[in-house]
Amino acid sequence: MHMNIDHARVRRESLRWIIILALNNARPVGAYEGVILSIAQSEYPDATPLELRRELDYLAGRELVKLDKEPGGRWHAALTRTGTDVAEYTVDCEPGIARPAKYW
């Protein structure tokens, strides 16, 4: 049996999980996009600022992340209460985020 893997989708969903984990570790202060990007680039060295912003916007749209788009151009992100619950496995995670299955 041949499986077609959508690599772009896997990458997007994995980046979203990486962002959530990074912001969970940055609580309660949150983090600027540059810090989050450097963390994302440890898994995806070719990750771009635009790609990161697209996924931050997605997570903000799902009300998992609060974004502060500063007038100077920098973005600051922090987890919402729901985002923290997703990171801590206390709520179900809807499709679109590559959260690993809970094993404990």
Regions from the language model: what does each represent?
Residues 81-104:
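Short, amphipathic alpha-helical interaction segments positioned at domain boundaries
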Residues 46-61:
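Short amphipathic alpha-helical interaction segments
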Residues 29-40:
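Short acidic, hydrophobic short linear motifs in intrinsically disordered regions
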Residues 1-30:
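Short alpha-helical segments that sit at the start of domains
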